[in-house]
Amino acid sequence: MKKNPKILLIGSGNIGGTLAHLISLKNLGDIVLFDVAEGIPQGKALDIMQANTLAGSDIKIKGTNDYKDIEGSDAIIITAGLPRKPGMSRDDLISVNTGIMKSVAENVKKYAPNAFVIVITNPLDVMVYVMLKESGLPHNKVIGMAGVLDSSRFNFFLAEEFKVSTNSVSSIVLGGHGDAMVPLARYSTVKGVPIPDLVKMGLSTNERIEKIIDRTRNGGGEIVALLKTGSAYYAPAASAVEMLESYLQDKRQILTCAAYLQGEYGVKDLYAGVPIIIGKNGVEKVIELQLTTNEQALFDKSVDGVRKLIEAVK
């Protein structure tokens, strides 16, 4: 990867602005902040660059409403679309956001066909599928931000339960980025000790872990209900930056993301949250976990929900 890659952020709302700030603080590359709303990306770019003078960052941020400015982007994060409001599911956004994603995909295909693309727009698993099909980019270069965020929420709740640092907790959440996602307690650990073993030690109960799993599934909705005017943006932005950094710096981290499946987990031609290795080529490998019959059934149910939504937009 070049020394100063060009990073494009499509959508300059709460997540887009937070992304620009985090990326500049990490000095990952120069940024183009795009939005259809005039003045918004330009104003946020100026504000963040002025803030960066206090953080010692000289990263350049260009705010624009012109798709021509995205030409030659090395990496793209897409947040454009309507956010959730109280009472809405991620799936309620499908009609409007599909149209937005198709327009974005056409311009990515035209101006940045070699970029690595991370989609955040909801409903995530459908939007990343639309991006792949409409842009014509290779599937290893188009992924969705889902499991990193869901796992971070699961990690936080587990750390609270066991009264430990979040740094000691590692978890995996599979499936679609929706209410049927599959947090896997069996593959989640506190400093290497699986959650079921900690339950056997009397440090928690199966009932309490199930409540945490349910809270993880509804983690986004909980924040939407509290904010009342939008959805989460700090954690989604931090999650996408983790993915971006692994690509730009060839870290080859194993992260749970919405990846295109070609037979893994018994699924073909669909995006779903699974562990993958992200390196300089994008998706380097899909990690196929050995699931129990019950875990596979839950995964299949989650994926079926994604499949039905995709059929609705075809």
From Swiss-Prot:
Any one of the GO BP annotations: lactate metabolic process
Pfam families: Ldh_1_C, Ldh_1_N
Residues reported to bind substrate: 84, 90, 122, 153
Active-site residues per Swiss-Prot or TrEMBL entry: 177 (proton acceptor)
Keyword NAD applies: yes
Residues binding NAD(+): 11-16, 35, 97, 120-122
Keywords carried by this UniProt record: NAD, Oxidoreductase, Tricarboxylic acid cycle
Reaction it catalyzes: (S)-malate + NAD(+) = oxaloacetate + NADH + H(+)
Enzyme class per UniProt: oxidoreductase
Cited function: Catalyzes the reversible oxidation of malate to oxaloacetate.
Protein family membership: Belongs to the LDH/MDH superfamily. MDH type 3 family.
Name of the protein this chain belongs to: Malate dehydrogenase
Organism from which the protein derives: Rickettsia bellii (strain RML369-C)
Taxonomic classification: Bacteria, Pseudomonadati, Pseudomonadota, Alphaproteobacteria, Rickettsiales
